[in-house]
């Protein structure tokens, strides 16, 4: 112990101490004791100089350890310190009378003497206990044991220097050896106990008052639950002396084992009152504190002896093996056995750790057989029934239920008992939860108790696992283990979910005005437990809400103590308890704790002025004190004896006495003093009235120098303020604290540090600083009275969400004005420090026997009614209702005292108006037999009436928050609905007194807002507001008023305007939206700042997370002030009753294109300081969702506090109910755990999959989940195939059997998903898995704790389902996957993979790098490892090697001695190949040269399937594509070559012989056999040895164009029957198609002579269903265009198209439609000189040609819609062009001419027939003239003389070829009669 100690002496002392402990069946190691005393010397440097170790000295050691624990924390103290201390303390106090201990005392005494001898060898000094007791304040009963004579060496460092806080807690510094008296040494035992102290002879058994107070304080802390115990050691067994000393020690009565509780809250506190284990005789002298408390705790000892040892939370087992002897049945203090109990010997766990020293070997020889017992009580079925009933009625975690379960702890329940109780009492779900929690807690206990290596079966005992599942074996567990089992069972039970849904928002739980603070905290903690889980009710977030949501009175009491570190909320409950509100406020005024306020101090005296309050609120035993209790022996007693007022009486101002004791009737000025009341009658108190709050009056300290200023600076008065200049009119006022002003806490009262009174005959006017309104701060003007002596306050409010006001900001000015007194009448003669102004006078209408009536006008008619706050709607009596006002019956019920079924209601909205001009609209009900009218809440709410209850408590709280009576409770400016618009004057800088005060200066408050938007144009955009319905108009007005009150919009005169519209939500409420499309077009888009979502797998592994959600993010971000006018809108008014109110947005509007970008930038700027200050934190931010992760929970909480502060400083609001602090976390659709990430575990439903759109959505959702699922692309192929086909989104689709199997695989992958977060300390591996169809990649990390265990996947990578090329080889796909993996690794994790695992060998990799550009690019600049050894993990074993890996059959060079083949193909469909100079030609079904040649190669592979060959082709595409087929996993189906490629691939994969394909350039006329062979193949394609089949060609032509039989017969020279059979075989053509008839309508004689034009509707064309059709009547050529309408502009567009196709007509004939008869079309025809004629109205026969063309065109469109050309109805122009091509160019007439031939080639070799004809007017025969057209019974004759056509009936026409006219028709003149040519 001394510095000169020898090693042998230390060993001797430690050996004796070990022997003493072994006597108590406690084994310790020597090195642990040496370490323990080394720490004692470090903590207590005075300990070696004491010279003796008795209970007093050892108690001082405990005090030092206790203080060391408080100052430096528990982590600085070894875990076994307090255990060893308690063991030695028990030896000192209980068993020191044994011979063994006596021998140890002697040896320790000798060692201490030798160790404490100073180097100078001076004579020893004797210091008795009495001398020490006289030199220090006794902290406990002094010891009477004389100390050992010791020599005190030099002590360089005193205790006060090392521990300044302990100087006053322990003994004074020890005197030097030279200053002490030398007395002979007295040798006594080194270790003394209480028995020796009792017989020491001292008679001083009384404690002084100071020590008695300390003792009471220590006793009050006897069982402090705030400090969990560190040890879980069972109670010490009764002492049984060893056999070698049993004869020398008399038997003693031993008490039952008890649990020693700490006194000071420190775990294992050494100063815990020791309950004696030895029956002591009655003390005859003074004893220590333990003996003094013996009588007081005698009852407690008896109770504690029967209690079970229940360790608190967080227990740690003491690492000392203890064996306990058998307890006799007659042991004192042992309770009698229970009928259901039996004694079972307990076995002791053997220490499995091997000894590493001689000391361990010596201890191992001790017997370890079980030698102690405990009582085991079986479970009682009645008890289980009670618990089951409590669980069913109250819930498993109700206090009553938990108390019943805790009552079972004395039965030493085994794990089997706990499992039986859980099954019997809990529900199925709760039973599973309890088992899970119990197993987890058991594992934790097993880990915590592992100090030495535990036995192999130790962790199995607590959960009762095999082989300890038998209840008999469990009952034999030692007491310490059973104690842990009880603790684990109770903990698991208490962690069960509470009864009730955890849906209550914490932010909505607020303390009521009359609600006690303890009830409010109880509700808050209960809700927190439901939301966050058990144990989180004391979190910092809940403590924060405990202040923020408290009522104003409690907030005032808590505010001074918020910055203190409080472990629990117990101090807050003390501050705000109902009977101590006055104490808390008094303490807050002096910055003291309430406990300090009650101590004898010279600063305060609390006088009760209203004892009735104590009679109402305090318990009956508490008497109202009249002054503070004082101690007569306290050093400050003299100051408190004569405590009195230090200021003059505020009543008379003439003497120093209390106002309550003032007897004067006149004040100092001779004025009479008006009697003051106690608020029974008279005016209400002012807003700052706090003098008599709850009956306490807080007086200033003695002497009252300056009680109000917070520092030692003198008080500053208004007269001390400096003016800026000589001409300044006002004095500036600045804030004295840093303040955050929000709309929730405004109006806010702030002190300015300036006090009254004002100069005589003056008063002050407080005005706002002119520059403040521009920053959103409003200062309410006020009046400062001349006689006000308190501190001046200013009242602030804000129109913004959040404004920060730094300390020293200039806020207001006070202008001093002269005071003019009108009369001498006043309410109070003296104001003092009460509220300034006359705000303590207000008017209310008190409730009396008379009914509160109100007169209102409804549509101008006066009505009188009663104010009914219980009525939902206004009801008018039928007798008062005007008869001419309409009524309607409504299907509802009115319920009150009676009931009215289907009452009548006003059929129109009525406008109400009061006498003050306020108005609104209501729809009242009308009831008969109603005596009076009732004004319901529908009209009272519009009038903004307020119910005021003048309760003293409520009124005091309201007044303390600045409420002005009589002005309402409005949020803005005390009841004013609209804020006062203040026009700032920028040229006014104020008085500037801050220029002379360096500590007080004006600081510009930055107002954060969004970035400015760039605009393309500066001209205003105005879009008129469209009208709204009456219902939506009222909703729009209400919503606009709501946004205006919230500060989101403001009135404006902006030249910009865009319309608003109102939609109804599903909930029935309305939503305001603005159409900003026109504004978005003229603004410059900012672009996306985050192209994708952040991946949660990049969060570091094992980081603690907190998720934050911002509330109404857009509405909390202010727009740039210059951008606000661009987002203006107008509120429509019905019938233009008034000008439309116009507003503009002050915050980010919804629907603006740049709002998401501005929101992201604003939030990112808010959290930028957090990122810079916390670089080790991982913060994810996306829009309004923020996730922060730190490596420890403490860092996460600190970072959370910082980020909340930063967000709040920017005005952003946090949604408290969406803050997530515990697992599982929900973020961006993911479920985050401590290590793993899960996507939503959904089950894919198939009942709704019916259309293409449904399957497209399903596959889109699956693609979003795939990066986190083990789902290869091959599993999605059947689902992807369903998407092929008809592109119509509503086209019908159905699940195939293969698709159903794919969905099953997908559901399985979703349920078995397992993706882990990354560990940046482990290597990142990219695995390329050769899965079928396409390869798959995964980011992988090995197991960080055990490399032999399986690793974890981080992210799965997949290639797109539709590749960019038709043929992609497997090596190319792997290269693409490597590129994607490296890109993703840099994007998400910021690094390249450490290694890449590929399915190729090193030789194959070398070959790929040499021959493949994709692999060279993929591995460019990669510095990691490339390997082909996959980890042996079952997760990746599903990816077996696939056959499409490396080419085997395809060769890159010609094959020696192989067959030489040449191929070629032509567009005529002939395929040719040459084998051994023998050409072979084949007719292919294709007309593309590439497909024909591919067909030839397919024939070659079929013919030469069993021999190698070298093939040459002149197609480079074929030469490059075919060699790839061997390694192509799948072929893209978007090309016509896909079927040929698929067949070739199957032939190649089935081949056994290699092949080579080379490329030759054709038509170069080069010499050599290769060129000759290629030329021979080319020539073979030009020979057509096979006779073509005209029927086949006709069939193909009909398939493409659906030609009629007549045209097929003429074009392909087939018979009529063959043509008709082809048409009949077509399912889409009508068999009985009528033959086109020429008709009898007038037709043009030449092309473009007459057009007929009309419009037909073809519905399948959709919007372009208006098909304009034009027919040339001469040739029958049809032109048509799809249009979107029939207006003149559409007609003109069609005519322009026709003019560009066939030229300009002479005449256009149409019907009388408005599109044709309109002025626009008439002008168009006139300008182009086109004659326009119309037919007879409503007679379509005049348009017969074009009408028949309509039907012909529609039939052709319907047939061609399914043509192989692939034109559908969604392509109107293409399909229409195809139909016109078929009608105009492919349809032939009887002469084999098409309409195009007739149009462009009107002259033919055929001669017109010449006839003679008789003029019907003159009966004269004329001619011969040609016949132009033969009709039905008529003909058109061309009169060559008249040069024009003439229609004649057939009877007037005669052919001149061998025919003459009838005789009856011959003319009289034979010279003119027609006859044969050449006849006379």
From Swiss-Prot:
Bias (Polar residues) = 117-132, 193-206, 323-334
Query: Could you tell me which SMART domains the record lists for this protein?
Result: G_patch
Binding site residues for Mg(2+) 3: 1654, 1711, 1747
Boundaries of every RNase H type-1 domain copy: 1455-1586
Domain G-patch: start-end pairs: 950-996
Q: Indicate the annotated site residue(s) for Cleavage.
A: 163-164, 318-319, 585-586, 648-649, 842-843, 960-961, 997-998, 1589-1590
Peptidase A2 domain boundaries? 863-939
The GO terms describing molecular function are:
aspartic-type endopeptidase activity; DNA binding; DNA-directed DNA polymerase activity; dUTP diphosphatase activity; RNA stem-loop binding; RNA-directed DNA polymerase activity; RNA-DNA hybrid ribonuclease activity; structural constituent of virion
Q: Which InterPro entries match?
A: Aspartic_peptidase_AS, B_retro_matrix, B_retro_matrix_sf, DNA/RNA_pol_sf, dUTPase-like, dUTPase-like_sf, dUTPase_trimeric, G_patch_dom
Q: What is its EC number?
A: 3.6.1.23, 3.4.23.-, 2.7.7.49, 2.7.7.7
Q: What is this protein called?
A: Gag-Pro-Pol polyprotein
**The organism's taxonomic lineage, starting at the top:** Viruses, Riboviria, Pararnavirae, Artverviricota, Revtraviricetes
